[in-house]
């Protein structure tokens, strides 16, 4: 097959990119698909990644692309809409223009997308003063007035966690009551406020949160919000091809990022609960090494079968 790739990678975040550099350095024929919409696109800086503290996600991607292209990895900037495995074990990938590509191995690293509350101001503040991970953005709100938005989910754990970074924490339920009586009692002991008024909007200036405006006209000053509203797969590619999923909606993988489908790997946020850039990159590296080892083994077996 003339245009058979060793590996096709779907997803151009840290997991897909790190797998690409590993495989490129192994002289593998690699094609990487990217839509340019990473989960942290609107973030003002990455953290917990040594030597890259507070780098803009776009700057990180540019550095990564420049490095990877040195090793012959090909890029296509288009969405992949489906993938399947044929009877000969070859993966067939189809893009949104209905063009197909073929590979021996497939790595899906498309990540997750956050369910941003559908309240005026949330989307505009997301990545600036509205966040979902205190380990990623907690330092930047140290000592400030921080709110936890938890209508659809129980926000107890996140509220307690934020006390590590600031003494001023309030849990906002937006009219819901997901808290257990014992949790309410504990929050009071931790000096964490509970606000049940329903949200009308976030008052902000260019994404800088100023106040929470409630229905009825009341308001409360607030510097930043962390929300607990769940997430979903950015695309359902892994699920649709038959990968097993966890109850939390992430793809089940083994220690080498392999799935229940032979030759198919998933790395990054799409497969794990700990959503750090550095963890996603490490998973991509693990997947890359395992994929190369499988390709080595298959090549040797093919040579032995010929002799």
Question: Regions from the language model: what does each represent?
Answer:
Residues 1-7, 75-144, 251-255, 259:
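FAD-binding core/adjacent interface of flavoenzyme oxidoreductases
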Residues 5-59, 151-177:
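Beta1-alpha1 glycine-rich phosphate/pyrophosphate-binding loop at the start
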Residues 11, 109-111, 116-118, 149, ...:
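Short, well-ordered coil/turn residues at beta-beta hairpins
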Residues 20, 156-158, 267-307:
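A conserved FAD-binding loop/helix module that cradles the flavin
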Residues 24, 69, 124, 163, ...:
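Anion (oxyanion) recognition and catalysis
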Residues 62, 68-95, 100-101, 166-250, ...:
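A Rossmann-like FAD-binding core segment of flavoenzymes
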Residues 124-140, 230-276, 286, 293:
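FAD-site-proximal beta/loop scaffold in flavoenzymes
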Residues 132-142, 146-149, 155-159, 165-166:
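Rossmann-fold dinucleotide-binding core
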